[in-house]
Amino acid sequence: MGNGCFHYLYIMTMDNLFLMGFFQKTWEWLDTLDRQLFLLVNGSWTHPWFDTILPIWREANTWLPLYLFLMLLVVINFPSKAISWILTAIITFAISDQVSSSLFKPFFARLRPCNEPELVGMVRLLLPNCGSGYSFTSSHATNHFAFSVFVFLTMGRVLGQWKWVFLFWAASVAYAQVYVGVHYPIDVLCGAILGTLIGWATATIYHQRFQSLTLDSKYSSK
């Protein structure tokens, strides 16, 4: 019986070592691919026009008119629904920002490419400074996808085909984060997935909690 236990422990140990080795090699492969793709986006797939536009494109202040437009759209056309929608949109942004910045980034503690010693001299930083925060996940990608998915799901019939523009907008901001040199592609990809899940969750809760106040109700009744 002792030999049986020893054999079982041996098999379990070898299996665990195999899995650890597999995951380590997989991560090393992904990390290498991630860095190579980053260098292509940041260093090869460039254009002077993008060098000027994308640093501005990614700035939150650039999009204040868009946020104000959406708020006015809701307030003017759906006054009884405005407060609940605006508050939920703000909560969506707050959750996505805190999950990305306060949970994921400290836990993974991945250096930004512009702070990575192995990439010194290889990164084109198009911002005044790299920033002291960590890289994974991209809060820009998380926040913009969370907000865009929330808008997409709660205002889809109001916006019509324009709802797709919000997803493209979020993707372009995420891409800009790689282009300007502050995030890896995996950072923005995972941030986009995380933001999508958060936006879907808050939109679902909004519909369940304020079913009679859904922005789409005015149009679906016609």
Residue ranges and their predicted role:
Residues M71-S100:
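Interfacial segments of alpha-helical transmembrane regions
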Residues W49, P79-W85, R157-W164:
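Membrane-helix interface segments
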Residues G43-H47, E59-W63, S80, H144, ...:
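Membrane-interface junctions
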